Amino acid sequence: NKVALEQEVYAARLYLEIERVRFSERLSIEFDIEPGTEKALVPSLILQPLIENAIKYAVASQINGGAIVITAKKFGHDLLLEVADNGPGMTINNGLVKNNDSGVGLVNTKERLAALYDNDFALVLTHNQPRGLKVNIRIPLQLEQTEQKNA
C-alpha cells in the first residue's frame, strides 16, 4: 500500500507531536522535504519505524535528548529518504547494524521494500557526522496520478 509522501510526512509529524509532549525541549525535529517530492509514492508508514528507532536510541537514551532530521529529495529517477539522528550511533558492518538490539523495525522495513520493489531499492545505514546514525532509503520515483476532471 503506497501513499503520497505528503501524507507520510503528515503522519510522521503527528507522531512526532506526541513524542514532543513526552520529551519537550529534549527533542529537536527538522523536516527537509524537497519541493516536487510531495506527490511521490512511498510505502505507507515507511518512516515510522525509522523515527521510532531514532527516538529510542538517540533521544530517549541521552540526558539532553537529541535531534532528528527527516529528508526527502529526488535523485535522477529515484526518491531518497533519510532519517538522521545525533545519538550515540551504532556499530555498522557493510551498511547493517552489527548488534542484535536494533529491533525488528529495520528488518521489517527491508522486507517491505523488497516485496514492493524487488531489487530496485536500497536501505543503508551510515554514521552521521559528527555523531549519530543515518538510515537512507532509495526507491524508484513514482508520482501520484492526479485525476483529470471534465471541465
Question: Where are the predicted features?
Answer:
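C-terminal end segment of the histidine kinase catalytic
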Residues: 128-151
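Two-component histidine phosphotransfer core
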Residues: 1-136
